[in-house]
Amino acid sequence: MKRIFSCSSTQVAVERWNRHDQKLLEAVHRGDVGRVAALASRKSARPTKLDSNGQSPFHLAASKGLTECLTILLANGADINSKNEDGSTALHLATISCQPQCVKVLLQHGANEDAVDAENRSPLHWAASSGCASSVLLLCDHEAFLDVLDNDGRTPLMIASLGGHAAICSQLLQRGARVNVTDKNDKSALILACEKGSAEVAELLLSHGADAGAVDSTGHDALHYALHTQDKALWRHLQQALSRRRRGGQRLVQHPDLASQASPSEPQAGSPPKSSWRAEPEEEQEEKEDEDPCSEEWRWKYEEERRKVVRLEQELVQKTEECKTQAAAYLDLENQIREQAQELGVLLSWEPRASGKQGSSLRPGGDGMEQGCPKDLLAESTQELKKQQQAAATVNPVLAPKKAEDSAPGKIQYEVHGRSQPEEQGPPQSPASETIRKATGQQLTTNGAQTFGPDHADQLPAGQKESSQVLGVEPGGTVAEPVGPAAMNQLLLQLREELAAVWREKDAARGALSRPVMEGALGTPRAEAAAAAWEKMEARLERVLARLEWAKAGLQVKPEVPSQESREGALKAAPGSIKQDEEKEKRVPGAQGEPLGALGGEKALGGLAKGQLEKEMSVLRLSNSNLLEELGELGRERQRLQRELQSLSQRLQREFVPKPQAQVQLQQLRQSVGLLTNELAMEKEATEKLRKLLASQSSGLRGLWDCLPADLVGERSAQSKAAESLEELRACISTLVDRHREAQQVLARLQEENQQLRGSLSPCREPGTSLKAPASPQVAALEQDLGKLEEELRAVQATMSGKSQEIGKLKQLLYQATEEVAELRAREAASLRQHEKTRGSLVAQAQAWGQELKALLEKYNTACREVGRLREAVAEERRRSGDLAAQAAEQERQASEMRGRSEQFEKTAELLKEKMEHLIGACRDKEAKIKELLKKLEQLSEEVLAIRGENARLALQLQDSQKNHEEIISTYRNHLLNAARGYMEHEVYNILLQILSMEEE
């Protein structure tokens, strides 16, 4: 079994698959370590040789995780970095199949951890794709490159995010992997994680600085892909990240996909919320309610406008630099044109000066060089050189000069197009011009009369007709015919390269303008002016390209007519004839003052070529002036943009940017509001404590009311049963005090009466009466009656002694009266004892009431003091409440003003958005035009490559012709010197005669 690759006509056996290789592959497939060791030690089988399926024993062992077999094969000389058909190494296969032990063995034996397969994926890509965290850790420990891009432009971190492998993402981020890299579709790792629906990976990426607002090529951000999943945790993480981003200065608008996900009436179960504002956690919403929403919104808008200004300033600086670069390029171009014109003037100025000694009849308008018009001289000399060199090449091909490269046509082409000569043509021309000048100088010192230039035919004195016939022939340039188009092609190549550079700069500017970061700035007047300027520049570049194409076509057609005529003249020329020599002598240019080379029908052709050159020169000068005008317009456009930016900055500072004093005042107001809020909370706490104390005191007062006597309570309830005011309490207490005083007075009177009674009863007790208690007034009255009765009895006994019955009755009455008196005295004693008891109880009760009254007075005084403090606190709280109400009204007024300004800002934002959409549409149209122009540019680049090859070939021919030209000049100079001295070889003389004869024909 063998495999042969045929890459040529002969088939060569590249790899021969023998039976030993097959046995080794089968042993590895079975995992037979002993068999693998035996076969590998024989050296008859190669472990890395591929079979017909593109697999080898070494790669199979790595993919199956056979660590022992892998170690044996490595010990027997297996190439550790060999690749299979897919370009995968053993390390790739081990990471694909998630074999960390094999990965460890391969890395220890020196496997290349940064090798890439056909998909440009490294082992770290496949380890991240398979979710093998151990392999990722091993590769990171061996310093594998973390941010390598595969064919899809994805890094290992992006692949791990797409697979939802949070552990691998954590390892890569800890090792320093870049989190905001995007693939070919402009999708970042966060967008891929949201597309997968992995909330854990998204949270990890956001914690490491992932940009939640980045969008892909379709214009969708991470939240758009998260809304297609049902993971609310993922929504919450993204919305919190966007909220933090909005707080940092970028305003968060309502996401367009949220409205489509939620129903217009009320959201369904499991559907995302209607807006990113409502989807935030409740805790975050409560925090936002505590904050001032108007001031926060104003601050966000201010930060957004400030960032727009910064972006506009950066863009203006960039455009200014581009304008400066273009201005410098145009200035260099103008300087090069002037230098080329000066060089042409230096090269051609010697001819009118030399011919001026014989008068101005030699060349009419010979001082045109001093007037800045060398094109007439250049056109005539070009035609003469072409014709004369063709004639010389027909007579003697060996001595045919090829020196047109250092003549004026090459330079006039570059002067016409405003470009300097290529570097490969510059050095050979300088020695040629020096040689010409040396030859001219020798002729001046020898003859003392005329200067003969190799590039132009000059006149001779009348006495030297033969010399004038010899010297009247100037070497022509056969190479001049292809040099003109070649030079023009080289010029077109350079101009196209410059045009390509301009297009690249324009594309870069377009890309910068079309990026989402610049969307906010597209609606400004400055962006509209910049777009209009770019449109003008695009139209001008198209016109310049059309002119260059026209010039190229005209210059490719122009040289064909004179060259064809020259070739026809050369074919008609016969070898030397005496008659032709005589005709040539008659037509000596010095006698008639007409330029050389204007012979016969060729004079009209020379005039035609001259007219074409003049027309092309005028057209190209016009294009040069147009370019200069465009440069001036660009400068004016730059100044106008600077003025607009300054006005925009002033407007933003005037309308959107708050003054420093207002900002400081706003900060102070916020601090004062915070302090007032804290004080209000403290006052609320103090008020609550006072309320509790007042309630306790009210309960104490109610207890006092309950302790008051029933008659006082009845009077209070009768007056105002529901009112328990302090005045009523004071009245009751004063009444109670008065009653207490009256009771004390009554008690004092009773005590006095008691003392009087005791004093009155003490004399009655002395005669032996057994009465212990003092007699009452009735008893005294009875005693008086008894005394009277006794007196009457004595009187009656005295008067009526005889009436015993009446006396017995009277005694009985007396006894009865005595019993009644005793009975009355007993009753009086009992009443006295009861009175003493009552008096003691009244005294004890009065003492208790006195103590209670003292306690009540103390409580009353304390309550009065507390009530005073409460009244002061209530008054202070009312005053502070009034201040807070005034501040709240002021803040409400400011909030209403800010709301009005925010509405104006929203209207302005809507207008800017409309302008932005309009500009985006215009940019899309321009991008389509740019694509078409790029296609044309590709076609032109192909032509440029062809022209470049032709130019290289012509450069080689130019070098050969210059060498021949130098030899011809040296030989020709010697012959001229010999002719001037009066002797010449016969062969040379014959050759010159032949040349003159051909010139006449």
Curated annotation (Swiss-Prot):
PROSITE patterns: ANK_REP_REGION, ANK_REPEAT
UniProt feature, compositional bias: Polar residues: 440-450
Residue ranges with Acidic residues bias: 281-295
Coiled coil start-end: 295-344, 610-696, 733-810, 851-968
Gene Ontology MF term list: actin binding
Composition bias, Low complexity: 423-434
Cross-referenced Pfam families: Ank_2
SMART domains: ANK
Comp. bias intervals (Basic and acidic residues): 402-422, 579-588, 890-902
Top-rank lineage group of the source organism: Eukaryota
Residue stretches of each ANK repeat: 53-82, 86-115, 119-148, 152-181, 185-214, 218-247
UniProt KW keywords: ANK repeat, Coiled coil, Repeat
Region (Disordered): 256-296, 352-482, 559-601, 879-902
Name of the protein this chain belongs to: Ankyrin repeat domain-containing protein 35
